């Protein structure tokens, strides 16, 4: 049994249903892919590793512009495609359809209130049309995104550090690449974005500790004044994004995967690829448990051991970088721009064999080998 029909839940459902297991997926909303606060930027490595996710591509991306608080522009560009921009709602729906084609059963408008692990099964209590219904199965996967209360009820703790995001679809003029905006007056401690999705359309958004909606309205007003968008009248979607992992992501008969587990890049808040990598690990561990009929906490611990081996270094370096950037004021951000441009650090990082759209740790450490930049951070 799987809680959540996002890309994580549907990918695990697809993997297990394809192996012939009976899978039931619960979703509290009435439609799959509703109210997704995500830019839909997915790295090429993710597409190459998971061909099943190659759905709903809107645009290929090989460059991005970064703007300092004063408006200085730093353009990063590669000769090859680095990422794809997808329709996230359509992306989630396509994955769910693939899982259903393999036999997975999807229950919509079904809110999971409780998960109870027993010796011989796991019981899930679901509210559907005002009625509480119990379902029993051999395993449960929590992949319902950030903010679920199920993990605390199961004694797995809660995510300690998180941010808030706000995003809206806007009409644009002549936007052909991703733009990122830095500065305390735009997104304090974080960043804003303008991401093209189709002809004349884009997603504008930002991350912030507090009041992301208010900050986004200010950003939209600025973009309108610059002539980049045609109106500020739009519907704003909000969402929470974890910056740190869940203290524990397993127990007997239960694993937690994706945003619900905090498997997200602390640098950007992106969780599609890391979540899928962990979903792959979870599917393998669950398959082994089903074959051996061993759903003990010890068996489930292999999942946490393996995903941490894969991601811990990236999450630790990324979190350090995130907290360091969050402490900077606009003057310091401007100085970093100046140092990067004067020393051509961005080109050095881009041309390095260590450079990756999805793996930021090596690029961060490489950039810090530059002495003027290292001195800024006391290294």
Question: Residue spans of the language-model regions?
Answer:
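C-terminal helical "tail/cap" subdomain of flavin- and related membrane-associated enzymes
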Residues: 287-379
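Redox-cofactor binding/interface segments in oxidoreductases and associated redox assembly factors
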Residues: 3, 142-143, 256
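Predominantly flavin-linked oxidoreductase catalytic cores and closely associated redox partners
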Residues: 15, 98-233, 262
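N-terminal Rossmann-fold NAD(P) dinucleotide-binding loop
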Residues: 9-10
């Amino acid at each position: 049994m799987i809680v959540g029909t996002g890309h994580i839940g549907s990918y695990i459902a697809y993997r297990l249903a394809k192996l012939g297991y009976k899978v039931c997926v619960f979703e509290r909303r009435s439609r799959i892919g509703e109210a997704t606060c995500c830019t839909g930027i997915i790295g090429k490595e993710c597409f190459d590793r998971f061909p099943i996710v190659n759905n709903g591509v809107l645009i290929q991306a090989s460059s991005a512009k970064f703007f300092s608080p004063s408006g200085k522009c730093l353009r990063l560009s590669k000769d090859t495609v680095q990422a794809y921009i997808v329709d996230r709602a359509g992306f989630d729906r396509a994955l769910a359809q693939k899982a259903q084609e393999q036999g997975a059963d999807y229950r919509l408008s079904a809110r999971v209130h409780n998960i109870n692990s027993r010796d011989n099964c796991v019981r899930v209590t679901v509210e559907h049309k005002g009625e509480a219904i119990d379902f029993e199965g051999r395993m449960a996967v929590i992949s319902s995104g950030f903010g679920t209360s199920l993990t605390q009820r199961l004694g797995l703790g809660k995510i300690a550090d998180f941010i808030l995001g706000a995003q809206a679809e806007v009409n644009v003029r002549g936007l052909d690449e991703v733009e990122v905006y830095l500065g305390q007056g735009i997104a304090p401690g974080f960043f804003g974005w303008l991401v093209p999705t189709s002809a004349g359309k884009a997603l504008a958004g930002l991350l912030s500790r507090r009041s992301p909606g208010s900050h986004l309205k200010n950003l939209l007003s600025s973009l309108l004044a610059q002539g980049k968008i045609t109106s500020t009248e739009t519907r704003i979607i909000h969402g929470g994004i974890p910056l740190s992992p869940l203290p524990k992501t397993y127990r007997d008969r239960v694993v937690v995967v994706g945003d619900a587990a905090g498997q997200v890049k602390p640098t950007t808040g992106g969780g599609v690829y890391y979540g899928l990598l962990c979903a792959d690990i979870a599917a393998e561990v669950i398959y082994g448990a089903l074959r051996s009929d061993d759903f003990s906490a010890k068996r489930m611990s292999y999942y946490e051991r393996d995903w941490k081996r894969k991601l811990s270094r990236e999450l630790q370096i990324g979190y350090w970088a995130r907290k360091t950037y969050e402490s900077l004021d606009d003057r310091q951000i401007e100085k970093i721009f100046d140092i990067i441009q004067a020393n051509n650090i961005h080109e050095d990082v881009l041309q390095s064999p260590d450079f990756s759209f999805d793996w930021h740790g090596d690029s961060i450490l490489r950039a810090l080998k530059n002495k003027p930049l290292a001195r800024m951070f006391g290294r």
